[in-house]
Amino acid sequence: MSSQYSNVENLSPQTIRQVMRELQEMETTPPEGIKVLINESDVTDIQALIDGPAGTPYAAGVFRVKLTLNKDFPQTPPKAYFLTKIFHPNVAANGEICVNTLKKDWKPDLGIKHILLTIKCLLIVPNPESALNEEAGKMLLERYDDYSQRARMMTEIHAQPAKCGAGAHGDDKDDDGPSTKKHAGLDKKLQDKKKEKLLKEKKRMLKRL
């Protein structure tokens, strides 16, 4: 999903400055549950880590998302993708995100922060009516418990902080510093057991489908 080419040269210096300013502001004062990953050599390739919101099947997961700015930005919206695998009605198999803010409701003054907050909101309130993943949309409407179980299982398998490249355990609110390393081995054993359990659940669930 990483971009094969950059649109930096096609963006106006004013747009580049505005984007960098906004990213630096978010780095200094991050929105709750969102951490931007700045690529200073290519501001058209923006990535961020979004914490799965509490009370959703995505809770305890960390999801890496990517925004790709095209040459007409901000007149036209960027494309947005989940780089972390996720089971969600509004996320296609290739990770592309469908949300009105990036389509008919786009306005040039919305900005990067607004987009990332909208994506986080989509984890709280999916929109099955405009589903890119029809199976997830149908399941959410007709069999919510099954949808929730599948989404939670995908989160536990694919959206663990280490796998998403969060890299900095110190950013986690529950982290108490040195003790994290002490318990790393135990955490790994627990994760392995959890994976075995999830795989069994997955097989059982797939038989029912």
Curated annotation (Swiss-Prot):
GO terms for molecular function: ATP binding; ubiquitin conjugating enzyme activity. Residues 200-209 have a biased composition (Basic residues). It comes from Drosophila erecta (Fruit fly). Residues 169-199 have a biased composition (Basic and acidic residues). Its EC number is 2.3.2.23. GO terms for biological process: anaphase-promoting complex-dependent catabolic process; cell division; exit from mitosis; protein ubiquitination. Gene3D superfamilies: Ubiquitin Conjugating Enzyme (3.10.110.10). Belongs to the ubiquitin-conjugating enzyme family. Catalyzes the covalent attachment of ubiquitin to other proteins. Acts as an essential factor of the anaphase promoting complex/cyclosome (APC/C), a cell cycle-regulated ubiquitin ligase that controls progression through mitosis. Acts by specifically elongating polyubiquitin chains initiated by the E2 enzyme vih/UbcH10 on APC/C substrates, enhancing the degradation of APC/C substrates by the proteasome and promoting mitotic exit. This is Ubiquitin-conjugating enzyme E2 S. Residues 14-160 form the UBC core domain. Keywords: ATP-binding, Cell cycle, Cell division, Nucleotide-binding, Transferase, Ubl conjugation pathway. The active site is at C98 (glycyl thioester intermediate).
